[in-house]
């Protein structure tokens, strides 16, 4: 067994609350989002983990979540690397639109395909495959080597940038990834084998309400 990789999706953002497609736009956390991030941090504190390094995106909602988790585990000053590679999927022309308005305009089915399919990009934006094509190389070069050297690594990022990672880690098919939604602020704790495959996965919270 080598190190530990913890993935956590940012807490509820202002645009999650307003039901807007967000992508690379940069809203902050809501009060609930702050509480969710703190709760995820408390779950990790109770789990007893101490991190060696943290990674997050260049977007404020993930950075704030990362800091709130680190505060909760008593590691407020831990080195944190911010990289655009971990950003949310770029929602292209949908960014800033209301998700219900988009359903009314393009239909429930089409919007679901844009939101959850593997390889159909929203207009002007990234498919999950496109997102994975930048998340996965960054994971391989910057994150995985640290985990394999035995470090405990926190990654605070986004619903779809993390779905693209989880798809590979959990060996999900294109059909299975369609159904996977990650809850805000719920940490997933992966222990990896020396060959980088997953030895164990624990979810510290409830993923069932995610949509
Ligand atoms: O970018 C967004 O709108 C959200 O962070 C994730 O949206 P989704 O649930 O539609 O993928």
Swiss-Prot record:
Pathway: Carbohydrate degradation; glycolysis; pyruvate from D-glyceraldehyde 3-phosphate: step 3/5. The keyword Isomerase applies. One of its GO terms (molecular function) is phosphoglycerate mutase activity. It comes from the Bacteria. Keywords: Gluconeogenesis, Glycolysis, Isomerase. It catalyses: (2R)-2-phosphoglycerate = (2R)-3-phosphoglycerate. Its EC number is 5.4.2.11. The active site is at 10 (tele-phosphohistidine intermediate), 88 (proton donor/acceptor). Substrate binds at residues 9-16, 22-23, 61, 88-91, 99, 115-116, 159-160. The keyword Ubl conjugation does not apply. Transmembrane segments: none annotated. InterPro entries: His_Pase_superF_clade-1 (IPR013078), His_PPase_superfam (IPR029033), PG/BPGM_mutase_AS (IPR001345), Phosphogly_mut1 (IPR005952). The record marks 158 as: Transition state stabilizer. One of its GO terms (biological process) is gluconeogenesis. It holds the Pfam family His_Phos_1. Catalyzes the interconversion of 2-phosphoglycerate and 3-phosphoglycerate. Homodimer. Belongs to the phosphoglycerate mutase family. BPG-dependent PGAM subfamily. This is 2,3-bisphosphoglycerate-dependent phosphoglycerate mutase. The gene is gpmA.
């Amino acid at each position: 067994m080598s190190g530990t990789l913890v993935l956590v999706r940012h807490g509820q953002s202002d645009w999650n609350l307003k039901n807007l497609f967000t992508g690379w736009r940069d809203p902050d956390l809501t009060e609930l989002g702050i509480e969710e991030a703190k709760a995820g941090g408390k779950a990790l504190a109770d789990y007893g983990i101490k991190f060696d390094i943290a990674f997050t995106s260049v977007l404020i909602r993930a950075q704030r979540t990362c800091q709130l988790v680190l505060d909760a585990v008593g590691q407020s000053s831990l080195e944190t690397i911010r990289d655009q590679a971990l950003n949310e999927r770029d929602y292209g022309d949908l960014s800033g639109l209301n998700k219900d308005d988009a359903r009314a305009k393009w239909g429930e089915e089409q919007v679901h395909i844009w939101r959850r399919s593997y390889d159909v990009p929203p207009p002007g934006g990234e498919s999950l495959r496109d997102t994975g094509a930048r998340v996965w190389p960054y994971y391989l070069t910057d994150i995985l080597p640290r985990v394999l050297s035995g470090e405990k690594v926190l990654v605070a990022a986004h619903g779809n940038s993390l779905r693209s990672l989880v798809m590979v880690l959990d060996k999900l098919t294109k059909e299975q990834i369609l159904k996977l939604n990650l809850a805000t602020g719920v940490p997933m704790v992966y222990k990896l084998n020396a060959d980088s495959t997953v030895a164990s996965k624990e979810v510290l919270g409830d993923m069932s309400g995610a949509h």
